[in-house]
Amino acid sequence: ACRAIAVSTVQEALTLGDLEVNNEFALPFAVRVQSAFLGWPALIQDELLDWLRRSHAATRSGDRTLTSAVAQEFEAFVDRVREARHNAPPDQDISTELMHTRIDGRPLDLRELASVLRNWTVGEVGTISASVGILLHWLATHPDWQQRLREQPALLPPAIDEVLRIDGPLV
């Protein structure tokens, strides 16, 4: 799934001409990959991407009322996902498994579920998009390695690991 998402995101980016890597490539890719991991339908990816942008803006603003309103939007979003999966088996995907999780004999309520998914989604999307940006910057500044990796694609996994070890997304 990740490879197909990467290919389609690259193909879309190639149609743009000039490209702002983070907003027009890394962030959309991260949202798509995270949505696939969570088992969320592709139809809600644009909505999630818009929500993430509003969430980042609200956080930067320091306005607690705005931040709270954006958090409520995510709860409504999660509630729709939960309703759509109400009768799904717990092993359908990771989101459904979480929705069937019981703590002290009771299921997670909407607020708890939204909190876990919000922290997970925002954190993972940030890490994935930062990693993509770091890797693209590294490739742009190391044309010799671009060529070497084109000629020897088997080197990609260790090269990616090494670049992200040197310049990690969480630093």
Model-derived features: where do they sit?
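Cytochrome P450
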Residues: 1-171
